[in-house]
Regions:
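Short, non-helical or kinked segments that cap or interrupt transmembrane helices
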Residues: 41-43
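Charged catalytic and DNA/RNA-contacting regions of genome-maintenance
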Residues: 46
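Multi-pass alpha-helical transmembrane bundle typical of ion/small-solute transporters
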Residues: 6-8, 19, 23, 32-33, ...
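C-terminal membrane-associated helical module and adjoining short loops/tails
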Residues: 2-5, 14-16, 36-38, 50-196
Length: 196
């Protein structure tokens, strides 16, 4: 994907080539850094969120040559979600879940997306579906049901629902439907490929 974005940017098809390539390079560096040191780095939840944020930024730069405020705001909401999710993932090898306060980061997308609920019926349904999915995912962290990997894979699939919600808020219903398809496909593939 990074190669395709870089080729499109360098080809000048969409503009913003230099910034898009710089953003793509930063994305590649963040991914490599995360892969190499995420187990040892206490800031790895931030780095993982930064990787996803840079996907939004790079795509925006390739397509339009600029980063609009809604892209940054949506990327920031996604960053917060990824910080919360990655914190949960870092607890995977512990006997019990500690320090629940980082889970508050998972609430940020819901605060940001609140106006989407009132804009359209579809946006409201997506909001409620995403909320229900996150609550269900977090239920795997209860002491009597403790299954941290189960929570993590569900929260990972939930990224697609957040994407769908943000796309609905951007008045892109067909792309929102595609993101919901991504959620379904992710859950199916998680039956074959370990998500953690």
């Amino acid at each position: 994907m990074l190669f395709a974005l870089a080729v499109a940017a360098w080809g000048g098809r969409w503009g913003g080539a230099t910034r898009a390539v710089a953003s793509g390079t930063a994305l590649a560096a963040a991914i490599i850094y995360y892969d190499v040191v995420h187990k040892r780095d206490p800031l790895s939840p931030l780095i993982m969120g930064l990787c996803r944020l840079l996907i939004y930024v790079t795509a925006a730069l390739v397509v339009s040559g600029r980063i609009a405020t809604p892209v940054l705001a949506g990327a920031a909401a996604l960053l917060a979600y990824l910080i919360g999710l990655t914190y949960v993932a870092k607890q995977e090898n512990l006997a019990r879940f500690r320090n629940a306060w980082p889970l508050l980061f998972l609430a940020v997308p819901f605060l940001y997306a609140m106006p989407i609920v009132t804009d359209t019926v579809g946006g409201g349904l997506l909001y409620l579906g995403f909320l229900g999915w996150v609550v269900y995912s977090l239920s795997f962290l209860r002491p009597q049901r403790m299954n941290i990997p189960g929570a993590v894979v569900r929260l990972l699939a939930g990224i697609c629902l957040l994407d769908a919600l943000l796309l609905a808020g951007a008045n892109e219903p067909m792309l929102a439907v595609a993101a919901i398809g991504g959620f379904i496909l992710t859950r199916i593939l998680q039956g074959y490929v370990a998500g953690t």
